[in-house]
C-alpha cells in the first residue's frame, strides 16, 4: 500500500484518520497483554499498539516476531494516547494497528540505534548505514542540505553561474600531495584529482563568465585530523573586476544569510578584521578563537635586563595569564602542559602563580626586580597562573597559542553558543619550509602580491605581502581567498621566486601563462569549507559527523575496505607494477 506520510510527522490533527506507515522497529515492548512498537523513520518515532482483542491473530503473531531494525508496513487508526510522552513530537498520539506486513528482517545490530552511541569510530564506519539511521546523524544531514540550499539560492540571486570543473586534472608540485590516477591511454602518464578547481576557475574568468561558483569535491593526500578528510567539499567562488572588499562583502552576506536561515542568528556586518601579524602576536594562531580572552602578552622589553639569561637573552619572551586558575593546576599538572608547547619548538614552559600580593614559583626569584611592573602589566589578580615561553618570536607565539586553546578547553572558558567570525588579512606571500629549505606559497602561487611589496619578489621574500584574506570561525579556518595574478610578467616572477626555472614553469603551467596573453581580466575569489562549516553549525568536533561516508584516520573506509589491492590484470592494463615488499610491510603495520 502507498505510505500515507512519515511516521515521525503524525500529529494530533491526524486523530481519527486511518494511515499507512512504513519504517524500522526501534523497540518492541509487551505490557499487559498489549504489544507496543516504536516505529522509526527519518522524521522520528511514533508508537504503535497491537491489541489482541481488536487485531487479527496474523497481525499479533507477526508483531510477536518483530525484533529491532525489522522493516515493516502498518495500517491503522490514529488515536489519542492515554498518557502523552512530552519528549516526542508524536507523543500525544499512537496508532491502533489493524494490518502489519514484515517487509524485511534484520540481524541484531552491532550497536543500538540511538543518539548516545556506544561504539568506537571504526565500528561506526564499518556499519555506517546503521550509524546513519540514528536521529542525530539524520539531523546533521538535514542541516547540511539546508545550508547548501541557502548557499545556492543566494549565489543564484547574485547571478553566479554554477559550472562543473574537471575531476581528472594535471598534477602540480605546489601544495599537499596529489591523489594520482594512471592513464591507460597515455602510458606512464597520470591525472591528479584536484586539490581545488583553482586554475580552471581562473580560466573561466578569462572566458568572461564574470561570476562562477561550484559546490565541489576536492582531494588532498595529507595527514588527517578532526577537521580534515582526504576528500572534502568546498563552496568555490570566483569573480572578475571586483575588489578585495567587494569579494569580502559578498562572502559576509552569504554567511549572514546562512546563519539567519539555518540558525536564526543575525550577524553584525561588516565582520571584524585583524592582520595576520596581529593574529599571531595576540593569539598565537592565524585562525584565532575569539570566544575567550587570554591574549598573548609581550614581555621582551621588561625582562631584557634581569639576571635570568633564559629570559634576558631570548629573542622574545611572551606570556599568557590563566585567570583564577592557580589552584586548578598542581606542579605535576603544569609539567604535563610542556607536552603541549614542545611540538611547536618551545624548549620549556616557565610559570608563576600570583597570590597574597606576590608571585611564587620556580622562577619567581629571578623576577623580583620587575615584580611590581609585571603584576601591573599583566593585571594579575588573586589565584592567577602565568605561563611564559622564551624563544624565537614564531616559536613563542605558536606554542603559547596552542597552550591558550588547550587551557580554554580544560578551564571551560569557551562559550559554545557563540559564533565568532573574523577576517585575517594582510598575509605574508611566502612561508619558510624547514623541510624543503626554501620559501613556499603561504596560499598558492597565483595570489596577487600587494603592490608596494611586489619589488621584493627579487629581494627579501619575507617582506612580500599578499592580497589574501581568510575567514575564521571559532578557531577554525572556514575559508580563504585572494585576488589573483592576471599579468604574465608578474606570474613568471612569482614562479621564479618559488624556485621554478623558466622551463619547469612552462612545463607545469604553460597553459595558464599562455592564457594570460589573451586579455585575462583582474579577478579574485574564495573557497569555503562546507564540511567544516556544517560541523561547526551542528556543534560537532569532527567532520566525519557531517560526511555521509567518510574515511578513518588512516584514510581508509572500514566498510568497503577502500583503498584495496587490485588485480595484476588491472595493473598490466595501466602498465604499472606494485612494490610487493611495501604492500607486505603495510599489511603488517
From Swiss-Prot:
Pfam family, one: GAD
Keywords, in A-Z order: Aminoacyl-tRNA synthetase, ATP-binding, Cytoplasm, Ligase, Nucleotide-binding, Protein biosynthesis
Region (Aspartate) location: 198-201
Enzyme kind, highest EC tier: ligase
GO biological process: aspartyl-tRNA aminoacylation
Domain of life: Bacteria
Positions in coiled-coil regions: none
Protein's name according to its UniProt entry: Aspartate--tRNA ligase 2
Gene designation per UniProt: aspS2
